[in-house]
Amino acid sequence: MGMNINRRSFFGGLAASVAMTGCKGLLGRGERPMLRLGVISDIHITTPGPESTDKFRTALREFRSLGADAVLVAGDLADWGLRSNLKTVKAVWDEVMGGTDAIPLMITGNHDFDGWRYGDMTLDMHMQGYSEDEALKTLGMKACWEEIFHEPFADIRKRTVKGFDFVSVEWHVDGKEKNDALVAQWLKDHAAELKGDRPFFFFRHSPIPNTVSSSSKDPENALYRALQAFPNCVAFCGHTHRTFFDEGSVWQDGFTAISIPSMEYQGALRGYENGSDHRRGGSKCSMPRMPMQGEHADAQGYFVSVFADRLEIKRLDFAAGEEIEPWTLPWPIAAGKPFAAGERAKVTPVPEFPSDAQVALRVYNADTRGGHWTIFWELTFPRATAEGGRVLDYEVRAEMAADGSVAAVKRFLSPAFHKVEREEPETVRVYFDGMDVPESGRYRLAVYPRNCFGRAGRPIFTRWLESKPGKAKAKGMAQQ
């Protein structure tokens, strides 16, 4: 997970944003960067009130104090996709960045087109006195954008800041979401303008397939394949609300890709007993769910300094008011590719439990997320740590005594995986569904601490167990 060493406070969190004085740039070597860039995504603005705008305002103030030449915002500006949402975005920008030369580099995301029709958001929108009658999609995104931001709008744009090109792609390209094939063709048509030793920045809302840890897998994706021809490309994407404490948020191969966290909330990963639910439900996970989105209300972003031989990327946790250990990408990309997934996996620290760590075990009766009564094993143990790193999750395996085989596996996110490390509780508690352990035979539950690349430290074990806890009773309850 993301390094927390050399962490420092750069302001007193959101509550102190008005009094914030900013922080000195982490420039190193006394050099002045050729470009300073603030990078955020998914600001999800609704109303003009501070509950909706303060996080965006705080980020802009920090970027202003650092002397940003431009601020990149990679989509989902307007949570409900309304004209008034977009006007609020512009008003906050003018309030904070007015009088500077900083250039706004903003694009649309799915919410900017369709947020008004997402069920829970439609209800919230109506309750606060707003209506889909002012939907940007209905009124015309191009007309509204140009009226509000006073700049030309196009599905694909190339803008230049201090000699560096920025290629932006909107959520809809030629009337189709993403439309990667058309974007790929645009890149091929403009290759002569973009290729070279100087980096150029590509940004859109959703991740490019086959890159960062939150991206989808599609080896034949046209955009992914097209960008392989541009080793000088640095691609920024948002959408997934993936915390930057996941070291897989940076990827290098034929080009560089970086996932931008959300300014509204960091999402819980799927595939975990305490992970994310799909918006429409259907989760079959057993453990009590992670806190809902409002309780994940963390705001994170980057400040990028471009030098002749490297990119320095500060990780800024605006909610905690802290700067996390930065990422430094040597330039050109051919200089070792230290952020290639395989290389990162080799050097990212592996978490370990304290030498005297033990697992406490008890039976716990509760309902699963699906509303079915069952019996859990409740496991309690001290948190794992990694020097210069973080624990992402804990893998619990039911290991058989007879042959060492693994009869069942469940994974649990560390309670504060998305927050600064000091927020991690000293004691972790997870729930393993007792109906998934072996029917017979001796077994024990082994707990493995893992980093974001799935590398595990040494496990700790429960006592040896003989059978399912309360199996007969659970079966009887299920049949009633």
What label would you give each PLM region?
Residues 283-415, 460, 464-480:
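A short C-terminal boundary segment appended to hydrolase-like catalytic domains
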Residues 437-454:
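Beta-strand-rich modules
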Residues 83-194, 222-229, 245-291, 295, ...:
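Extended active-site neighborhood of metal-dependent phosphoesterases/phosphodiesterases
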Residues 191-212:
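Short acidic, glycine-rich surface-loop motifs adjacent to enzyme active sites
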Residues 423-439:
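Signal that preferentially marks extracellular ectodomain short beta-strand elements
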Residues 26-86:
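N-terminal active-site segment of His-dependent metallophosphoesterases
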Residues 40-41, 71-76, 104-110, 202-205, ...:
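Active-site neighborhood of phospho(di)ester-bond hydrolases with catalytic His/Asp-centered motifs
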